[in-house]
């Protein structure tokens, strides 16, 4: 049916049921019973009209209905439709009528739309339903509207007032009959459009040619070039939609270039679960072999029951992997929608591929058997001239399979021509077997080695008889519990016999010397002697070649290349070296001269006071090549047996490093390294200035022009050669510096104004260094006019003497306090009254350093640990006493120093022995568990700390990035840790040692733990805490951030979260230069 007929009657509230039903034709168009197609009707009468309604609105309809008066069938068609009653059936309803049922738009009942042809009648039930519908009424079919407007009569197929409507030519005589055209003319400097009468003799021209658009034959357009068709927008499917619902299923299958052998079904399901809710998941197997095809059907559903959500999830899954494919667990899959029985086609395709592979394998096996039979027949015909060594009896099945399977090339050296039992990797991966399972099950056989290879598990035997015995007894009888299916699985072994076991004396292999070779058997004594003679001759020939090269060819070649034989070349070489040395010497002289000139230029008037802009900076260049040689010599000094700690750490796995017994090595390396750094450091600004071009000198203009100087009588400045030498010879303290801010000659002094806010006379005298300071002081005091009386002037000298004496007494008292107590006494600790009157009060931790020696932070680490044979460098008497008491005879044997690498190697061997014993026992037990971190920890000890309570100290020197100790404690869950923390606070335990490992695990070392819990916090720590995995469990390990000397306290940053309440913040007592003041 036409669009116009459907839309024109939509506003009337009811429809007419057409008697003729459209049917599908082969061309894809609707076909009516009278023989006319819908396309013919719409193509002949496709006109647009506008209609005015009474309410003033305007609507546009498509006039696709046939209204020609000449077509009798058309008039009969509309007359028939007008006489019938019932709902109108559009294209969608027409399609639904062929299915037998369509849903009514006016009731919840289903209406049969199976209509008869034009000459037939409707069914009884349908006629009864259609009679209940009200008759259709044309809204605009009134005389009042017909006389005013130009409407179309859909029943008669004619226009109202057709004869009364006139053209615009007949009504308006002012307009030209030939029409008008618009031109663009230049007027008043601007282009304007004008309308002109059109004459028939004027030929029309394409305006695009005037702008040069069509000169090349192609139309210039701004449309985007599309290389492919654009998909139409998806239309939501509802209850009024016709046709099948959108597909909610996807099919996942392996790509052609991917071999999918080891992937679980749950991995596929979990991957596609992110696109929507999966209601059905199915994996398909090969019906012939029951092996998985890795073809999956996934159906999406919606919790709300909306089919559009499920279809959208399936569509997004396909759209995501449409171009690049889907990669799951390293395997590539293709994803498509399940339409038009595509699932069955894919399954049949993969089944056919498997059948072809099986046929090919059978053909290869048949050919191998035929070839083997032919070889046996040929041997029988040749007779028994050569007798082969006897082999153990092998079953036909295992022997034939052994001849087909070969050892991988990378395992030839390890196998070394020995018998092997093989288990396929596909079978092992499917059931998640491991090498330890086979080791435990076959512990009663003489297996040489177990290898886990990408192609499977290989079990190597030293003797064929042992391999055959194991294969016959265990193949098909051995069962191992599957980790994927949770049931015992029968294991079938594949015996691979050695390939070269006949007439082979030496097996070429790259294996280690401890691998066992298969003994070679000879049939007769003559064969053995002949093979031995050949090998001896081969060895003698090889030795002879080496001897000739060393004794004859080598000396002859070296004698021919002697320098004395080529005097001309030597002369040329010496001449070149001499010229090179001269060039270097001249270059050094030029550089030295330039450096002096630049130094003189820096001290002239404009160099010192010419501004601080970057454009005025001169490029500082290093012209001395000797300095480079000097730095290179400094670097070579480090290679003479002493290297920095960083290099020692890098060589940890390559060479043996000895653990330093004292910190001399560290200090020696650090001193040389510091000297090298002082010589080799250069600022970034200098490097930028070196790269800057020398054109800046040319661009700089003279500060003053000679014309102006001559007019004003100013003499030109001439650099004084003698004056510059005086400046250079001056002390470095008084040399001027070209800086943005003037720098003082003397360093600034800080005065203690704690007890008094005024400076004493001694401080004032010490502050005045030279005459310039005295002049400045006079200028400052000139503004102050004191009232001087005879009494004050007479007592002035006495007051100066009194203040001077007070300062000296205070300095003397402070010196006594430092000498006796080690620090100054704080005035806050001085009691204002008697001790009994003051009572008990809490003293802050920062004040305890005045009377507790172990709470003081000094530059050298406080030695609170009593170490045997320890020497204090700061007490020479003690050093002499210990040296005299600890003297040993000169002929004593030097103590052997063990390296850290040897210790790690022995620990690894010990760990391997324990693992072997655990594998032999076969049961998981904690009796043989070994903590590897206990073997690698450094010697440490706890003692009283200068920071807080107890601390941890290093007994030996520790290099940077080395492990120190493990933080050991009781492993508890997070809720238990929170409960214990509250209990500790309630019981009065101020310090709780809770260390978080992850979100769910906390280590509590409060009551059960090691000495690592005594490590204190510091804002500038020398250690750090790391969480590593050892034996499958997370552990907290303390590592060194820098080189740590012996007897130095170990600290690390607690990294507490910032507390919002200031009262709950804990003060930090680390005393570091960058101390934050609080722990949290």
From Swiss-Prot:
PTM annotation (Phosphoserine): residues: 625
SET domain location: 938-1055
Any single Gene Ontology cellular-component annotation: chromosome, telomeric region
SUPFAM superfamilies: SET domain
CDD domains reported for this sequence: RRM_scSet1p_like, SET_SET1
UniProt note: phenotype after gene disruption: Abolishes cellular H3K4 mono-, di- and trimethylation. Increases the frequency of Ty1 retrotransposition.
Annotated Post-SET domain residues: 1064-1080
Enzyme Commission number(s) from the entry: 2.1.1.354
Full protein name: Histone-lysine N-methyltransferase, H3 lysine-4 specific
Organism whose genome encodes this protein: Saccharomyces cerevisiae (strain ATCC 204508 / S288c)
Gene: SET1
